[in-house]
């Protein structure tokens, strides 16, 4: 018996790019409000998407770009609580170091013609000429007065 693969694309390029772009926000200082964007103190030389997480027992940082996937995790094998204030920073430093060492040239996903890039204020969600780029599948005026 040989299984026959049924090739079926489950995700479309536009949705993937929107999700990838959203995951770059932890590096963007524009998202610093009452608390800092989780990776704003650990910038990388090139674009990466990232997700961080922590509990009392461990901390992780996972990220990717078209060329690399990096995951760093810290915790104790015996499941002890991490009590040092710096413990949750370690995976971020590891991620930053590895990303900067591995990726020398910019490499990021290219938007398709179906996506519109709209600059917005990340706090208000309103149009802002020098705002953070937001991708939309729905046609929207580039400026609310248009």
Specify the residue positions occupied by each region the protein language model found.
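A penicillin-recognizing enzyme superfamily signal
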Residues: 1-145
């Amino acid at each position: 018996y040989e299984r026959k693969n049924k090739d079926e694309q489950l995700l479309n390029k536009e949705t993937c790019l929107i999700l990838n772009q959203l995951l770059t926000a932890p590096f963007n200082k524009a998202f610093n409000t009452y608390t800092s964007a989780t990776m704003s103190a650990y910038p990388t030389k090139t674009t990466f998407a990232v997700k961080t997480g922590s509990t009392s027992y461990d901390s992780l940082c996972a990220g990717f770009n078209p060329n690399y996937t990096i995951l760093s995790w810290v915790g104790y094998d015996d499941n002890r609580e991490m009590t040092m204030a710096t413990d949750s920073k370690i995976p971020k430093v590891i991620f930053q170091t590895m990303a900067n060492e591995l990726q020398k040239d910019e490499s990021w996903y290219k938007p398709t013609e179906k996506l519109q890039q709209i600059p917005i204020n990340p706090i208000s969600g309103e149009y802002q000429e020098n705002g953070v780029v937001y991708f939309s599948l729905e046609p929207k005026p580039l400026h609310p007065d248009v």
